[in-house]
Amino acid sequence: AGSGIEGADGLCASLAQAAGLGGAWVAWVSTSSVDAISRLAADGRWTLIDGATEVFPSRGDVQFGPLHAIDTAENGEVVSDLGDVFVWTNTDRFGKNVTAGQANACDDWSGQTGTADVGVVVDPQAAMGLSWTDTGQPRACGSEFRLYCFES
């Protein structure tokens, strides 16, 4: 799938294709030069893969957190251990790079050294609902975590 943000997008695209999902897909990750929010369509509305369960009514609503946990994989599998599943993002609740002005996440997603910020799959009604994209607890770049993929 390659490396960097293109590699993350490629992984999202290949997983979506394997699951029979159409469209183009991007990973919800930020780099030193690209904020995740800028990669989403301005007029978007995002749901879980069922097409009915609304997560974000619009791009502007991302800052308020998801209406429903982003708890469904591309194959329909529901993540049941909410609060224990980490997701690579390096992105704050406004969709901006968490480490702006600093050494960036895992060499802009091309390396395995250093750390990057993660989100966590959570119930949006929980006290930690906004940590879906930013826990404030960076993790080692060599770790294997999930990605949030948005249809673009």
Stretches found by the model and what they are:
Residues 1-152:
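Secreted/extracellular ectodomain signature
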